[in-house]
């Protein structure tokens, strides 16, 4: 089991939660990005730098993740691809993607893209709140407990 992070867009506060969790759970945590990242010294935490470019980090995560892994991403198409491989996917707000919800999320994403392309101002996501951080940490722990039961 490995935790993969789509690190270019992952908020720093979520990375901090993941650093602590990797140590506590003694699980590999791999942050994939197209830029250099600073991470705390740990035998469990490493970075994987990829070339800059559209979806390069996403494609590398899809290529390397396996069933049973966890992928942290707000990228809905990436989440859909890793779910197909049998990995779990969690966004930085603590929402766990599932086979049951991913189609709806993809449809909504495509609809919002269409609105933006036609000139409609859709705004961005709200700032990550303390409640979002707590929800993320709770869902991360829930995933960990579920994965331990499956062993």
Curated annotation (Swiss-Prot):
List the CDD domains: PIN_YqxD-like
Name the InterPro entries for this protein.
UPF0178
Superkingdom: Bacteria
Family note = Belongs to the UPF0178 family.
**What HAMAP family does the annotation carry?**
UPF0178
Protein name, UniProt field: UPF0178 protein YaiI
């Amino acid at each position: 089991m490995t935790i993969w992070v789509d690190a270019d867009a992952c908020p720093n506060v979520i990375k901090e939660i993941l650093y602590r969790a990797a140590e506590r759970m003694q699980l590999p945590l791999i942050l994939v990005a197209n830029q250099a990242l600073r991470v705390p010294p740990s035998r469990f935490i490493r970075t994987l730098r990829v070339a800059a470019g559209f979806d390069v980090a996403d494609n590398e995560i899809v290529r390397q993740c396996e069933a049973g892994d966890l992928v942290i991403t707000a990228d809905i198409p990436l989440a859909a691809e890793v779910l197909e491989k049998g990995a779990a996917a969690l966004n930085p707000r603590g929402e766990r993607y599932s086979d049951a919800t991913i189609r709806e999320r993809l449809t909504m994403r495509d609809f919002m893209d269409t609105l933006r392309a036609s000139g409609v101002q859709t705004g961005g996501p709200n700032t990550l709140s303390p409640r979002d951080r707590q929800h993320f940490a709770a869902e991360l722990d829930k995933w960990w407990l579920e994965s331990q039961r499956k062993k």
